[in-house]
Structures are given as C-alpha cells and as structure tokens.
Amino acid sequence: MKGFHAFCVILLIFGSVSEAKFDDFEDEEDIVEYDDNDFAEFEDVAEDSVTESPQRVIITEDDEDETTVELEGQDESQEGDFEDADTQEGDTESEPYDDEEFEGYEDKPDTSSSKSKDPITIVDVPAHLQNSWESYYLEILMVTGLLAYIMNYIIGKNKNSRLAQAWFNTHRELLESNFTLVGDDGTNKEATSTGKLNQENEHIYNLWCSGRVCCEGMLIQLRFLKRQDLLNVLARMMRPVSDQVQIKVTMNDEDMDTYVFAVGARKALVRLQKEMQDLSEFCSDKPKSGAKYGLPDSLAILSEMGEVTDGMMDTKMLHFLTHYADKIESIHFSDQFSGPKIMQEEGQPLKLPDTKRTLLFTFNVPGSGNTYPKDMEALLPLMNMVIYSIDKAKKFRLNREGKQKADKNRARVEENFLKLTHVQRQEAAQSRREEKKRAEKERIMNEEDPEKQRRLEEAALRREQKKLEKKQMKMKQIKVKAM
C-alpha cells in the first residue's frame, strides 16, 4: 500500500508541473505541440532542413516586352545549426523593406543579359523603297542598253549583208563577161569560181576575180559602215560617212609603163600623198586643179609628169570623171605601188619595199550612210570605167624623153633611200661581223683537243691578216687614182 501511495504522489506532482508549463505557453500565445517522444523537437528541425523552400520566381518586364527569369539560389548556410537558420528566416520575413539599403540597385545594367544576347535594332524602311521599280532603275538601264545593242547588231549585220548581195547581183553579169574566174575563196588548191562574196567580217566583203588579159587579178572589197556597232551608229549621227567600194587591179609587169598618177577628191589626194609611199616620193607637188581638162572643182590631179596626165585624160575618161564625180573618192595608177608608208620603231627600213604595178579605185556609195539596195545600181558605170582603165593602162606608153625622166626619178629615189639608210646598214653589218666573231671564239673555246684548238686560232689569225692586207691594197689604189 505504501508503494501505491508513493506512485499516486508522483503522478500528482508530474501533472501539476505539466499544467503549470501549459499555462505559461498560453500567456505567451505561442503553442507548441509535444509528443511523448523526447526527441520530437529534433525530428521537426531535421524535416525542415530536408525539405527545400520553393524557389521564388521574379518576372521583370522591360520596354521591349522582353521577359527575364531570375532564380534565387539555395542558402549557402544550410550546413549551419538549425536554430540560426530558423531565426534568420524569421528575421527576413518580419523585417520591413529598407529603401536606403538597396539604393542604386535598379540603376545598374543587367550585365548577364547584355552578354548573353545583343540588343536587336529594328530600322524602319520607307515603304516606297520596298516594292517600287525606282529601286531598279540602274538594272533597267543596263538591260535596256544590252537589248538595244543586240537588236542593233542583228539589224546592222543583216543590212550590210543585203547591200553586199545587191551589189553582187548588179555587177555579176559584167564581171563574168570580163573575167574567167569570179569569186575564188582560196580554200582549194585549184582556182574555182564560187560565184559568191567572201565575208571577212560583219562589214567587209571580198571578191577575187582573175582570168583576164594584161592583169594578174582584181580584188574587190566592199567596205560598209559598222552598222552592227551601236557606238559607231551614234558617232555617225554627228559626222555622216559613206560606204565605200575599193577595187585593186594588179597589172602584169610588161603591160604597164613606169609612171605614177592619181585623180580624185582634193582632201582624199592630200591624205593619200601623206600616207602612200609612191605618191610622197614621185609626186612631191601639191594636188593641181583639173579645170584645164574640164574636171569639176571638187577633183584634183597628182602626176609624176605632165605627159602622163595628157595621156590619161582622154574623152571617155573625162566623161566618167565628170558625170560621177560625187561617187569618186580616188583613182591611183602606179608602177611603184607598195601601200602605206612603213613606220618602224628604230629608224628607216634597211631595204626598199616590194612594189607592184597597180590600179587602185575607191568609190563612195550614194546615200551618205543611208544606203538602200537599189542604190548599188548607180555604181555599175564605175565598174565599166575600171574595165576601160585596165585596157587604157596597157595601151598607154611614154615617149623616149618621158621614159628617161621616169628612170631618173626612180634612180634618185633609190639613191636618197641608200643615203638615209647608209649609217643603219653599216651598223647592221658591224653587228653581223661581231656576232660571227663571237660565234667563232665560242667554237674555239669549246674545243677539247688542245692541238685542234691551236690550229683553229691560227686559221682565224690568218683570215684577219688577209682582210687587213686587202684593205691596205684598196687604200693604195685609191691614192694612186687620186694622184
């Protein structure tokens, strides 16, 4: 019984103590539940440390409607004691926001966002430049110019072809009646008549005729304007030019005498006298008027001697020159024809150019550039004049005095040429001798056999001594003749 009473006393004491503690918590208005387990307080703290607080998401909007998300990291002080963590969390929630503590924070730029992404700049483009033909005016001009050039090329090429064919159709019967071969293109070994023009390019056509007495052949060249070139077409608007027909007849040496003669437009003769080798050497006087023979004022004459002019200006030739003066550019007869002057970079040529007995005719096509196929018929009488001139050149012969004068003129021209080129020929001969000596020395030095090398040197010395002796003998002969 005593044990039972002692147990009751202990229960009463324990109950009074627990009731006193419960009253104390009510006064402080902070109620905490206690479990029967004495370590319940520690278990609650452990659970708080394991469960992480949810991360707070802060969403900020800027002026360009861009959003950035910032995540708060975990507290680095989780490894500290649990009571300090609870007290710190409670303090942050209970303490009011201090404006002075975060002063200037919002003014700082967000360096992390600027590094990760560059700002986008949107440029306002004017609406009239986006979908307008004015934006492509340069391309439009280039395409238009290209199309114009192509169209002009096709049209100009076709027109030149039509003009050439019209000329050939008009003159074909006359040519075939005077020449055996008409239209040889030179591709075959044997001369064959093709009966058509040879196109050299878009504006030049050739026709070779042969098989006639007193001449080797006749080359006809149709030189049309460059109608296929747009720039040339624009240039001709400022300065009109005519199409031309050039006829070159190569005479046999025995069928033409020695003389140089030319007749044609005054400006054309002045230009030819400067450019052509034979006219500049044998017709040094200025072009003379042909009024003495009844020629129009637009025509002038260049002649080596008066006898040639009198012989060429017969009635029929005067008829052609008078009636077709507007179509005649120049007529050039020469036994010393070599073409234009040869201009070399280093002085005069060392030898006279090769010459041929030639009759050269240059005619202007009517129309001054605005030519039509029907205008080619007007050139047919001029072709008759060419045929007549071939026969005239064969029949014409100089008298004895004229022949002697012509020979003196040719000897004078050759002598003047030799004087001009004497120094150059001496320099050329000296360079050839030095080159020959140099080659001989190299051959001697390259000889491996000493005995043979010695013999070659002795032979070279003997040759030099013989040359010196010959020069000395010539000098003695000159002195004897002078005495």
Swiss-Prot record:
Span-the-membrane segments of this chain are 136-156
Q: Where is the composition biased (Acidic residues)?
A: 60-104
> Keywords on this record?
Chaperone, Coiled coil, Endoplasmic reticulum, Glycoprotein, Membrane, Signal, Transmembrane, Transmembrane helix
The question of whether Cell cycle is a record keyword is answered with no
Q: Where is the composition biased (Basic residues)?
A: 473-483
- The superkingdom listed in its UniProt entry is Eukaryota
According to the UniProt topology, which residue ranges lie Lumenal? 157-483
User: Which compartments is it annotated to reside in?
Assistant: Endoplasmic reticulum membrane; Rough endoplasmic reticulum membrane
* Chain spans, region Disordered: 44-118, 424-483
Kindly list any coiled-coil regions of this protein.
Answer: 450-483
Leader peptide range in chain numbering: 1-20
Instruction: State the protein's purpose.
Output: Component of the multi-pass translocon (MPT) complex that mediates insertion of multi-pass membrane proteins into the lipid bilayer of membranes. The MPT complex takes over after the SEC61 complex: following membrane insertion of the first few transmembrane segments of proteins by the SEC61 complex, the MPT complex occludes the lateral gate of the SEC61 complex to promote insertion of subsequent transmembrane regions.
Q: Which family does it belong to?
A: Belongs to the CCDC47 family.
- PANTHER family assigned: ADIPOCYTE-SPECIFIC PROTEIN 4-RELATED, PAT COMPLEX SUBUNIT CCDC47
What is the protein's name according to its record?
PAT complex subunit CCDC47
